[in-house]
Every structure is written in C-alpha cells, then in structure tokens.
UniProtKB/Swiss-Prot annotation:
It comes from the Bacteria. It holds the Pfam family Ribosomal_L18p. The gene is rplR. InterPro entries: Ribosomal_uL18_bac-type, Ribosomal_uL18_bac/euk. This is Large ribosomal subunit protein uL18. One of its GO terms (molecular function) is 5S rRNA binding. Part of the 50S ribosomal subunit; part of the 5S rRNA/L5/L18/L25 subcomplex. Contacts the 5S and 23S rRNAs. Belongs to the universal ribosomal protein uL18 family.
Amino acid sequence: MDKKTARLSRSKRTRIKLKELGHTRLCVYRTPRHVYAQVISGDGSTVLAAASTVEKDVKAKCKYTGNVNSAAIVGEVIANRCKEKGISQVAFDRSGYKYHGRVKALAEAAREHGLQF
C-alpha cells in the first residue's frame, strides 16, 4: 500500500465515524500549492462554509499560498465565516493527513478565532 492509498483509507475511517455521530465537520484538503477547508453538515449533504488559498482575498494576504502562514490565514477566514453562519462547534476532519505543518496551523488558527473542536 502506497502513501496515498494509506491516507485515503485513514480518511474513510474518520469520515464514517463522524457521519455516524452526525457532527458538523471541518474538512481539510491540501496540495503542494494550495490549502482548502470546508465545513460540511452532519449528514454530509451540504457545504456550510468554505475557504481556500485560491480565493483572491486570501491570496492577497499571503506571498506564497502553499505554506504554513497561508494555512493559518485560511483557518482564520473559515472560522470567521462559521461565526457569521452561527456555527461554533465542529469535528476536525484532517483527511488522513498528519496533524503537523499546514494542517496544524489551519486548526490552531481556527481555534484561536472561535471554532471549538
């Protein structure tokens, strides 16, 4: 089993558990160039809020979109958008990635700006 397949199987396990519990989840996806975050409803049918480094307002705040600083900015933006929609508590779905680097920066920034995991 290669790295990508192992990550995908870890993410499937997490998503199944979160779907059973019915919690709203903050889902993270990363590429070498960008970081994406979505808040998805408990049943998995609706995206309630989203933010990424592809967006112009986020891209303007950072020099390079694939690093820890830009991930922290995405975490801040997603937390603010959740506040506007009245969402304060989410389950953190790291999509099988290690809790390190960009994923950790996004999570900590979201926590600092009012999201509870």
